[in-house]
Amino acid sequence: MWLAAFVFALTLPVFYSCSGDDNGKTASANVNANNAQVFPEYARMEMPHIKDGSRIIIHRTDAFGVNYIVEWDDGLRAQRWTCYRLDPDNSVKKGSRSGWWHGKDPFAEDELIPAAYRTTLTDYSQMTPHYDRGHICPSADRLNSKEANQQTYLLGNIQPQLNGFNTGVWLYMENKIHGNSYDNIKGWNNTAFRDTLYICKGGTIDNNNYTRSNTGLVIPKYFFAAILRVKNGQYNALGLWFEHKNDHSTSLKAYACSIDELERRTGIDFFCNLPDDRERVIEAAQPNDALWGLE
């Protein structure tokens, strides 16, 4: 069961599920950093700059603290992004979807979002044509506990996706992050490659870059991922931009871009808690194809 504390700061409502200590570290002060005086989670490295008036949803577990964070737009009934991190502590594997759910449907409404603004299982089941319930923070990135895994199935972490996209290039991108031995994909989430991966993903819900389903769900025209790798004090970033269409590509090279370019396309200020001088260099750099294994 999730425990929620409803807190308001400025115009930003913040919602917590469960408890636990936050292991985020506040970066040096800079002009575009989030204000973390009241909510220290805002200073986490994976956090983008928060859009004024948005609802911030923080899901936590007792064992691992912050599981993931969502920016939710009440007016659109849609999430703008989910951000999370991968590190040696939260990357331990203690179970699997099949072992935990035994064929049952684990998807559920996100009760940290007020009923008037949340999406529902019926919104998805009555969609015509059909769209998948596409994870933003994937189930496979949260296998450290049943609680953490279950939270990835909350509809606040879900966007409608075409099946040929969800099971195609989006799945391939997910596998490149966490690895997939069955398909012989070596992922980035390993100690040889990273100390920590900071990840922000989502679909476009601004500037009319979306359509709507017959049930009123926002359907993004594009999806994106911003990934920051930290290893031995070295920082490298990768932006990924996907048109939302049936696409079974098994190469990410054509979708890769700098974080600056991804910010231009999405209107989102990624990794805003980095010191400004470091942020400018990291986000302007073009992706290192060899480092990321882009093919």
Task: Name each region found by the language model.
Residues 13-295:
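Domain-level detector for secreted/extracellular nuclease and nuclease-toxin modules, and
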Residues 4-13:
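Bacterial N-terminal signal peptides
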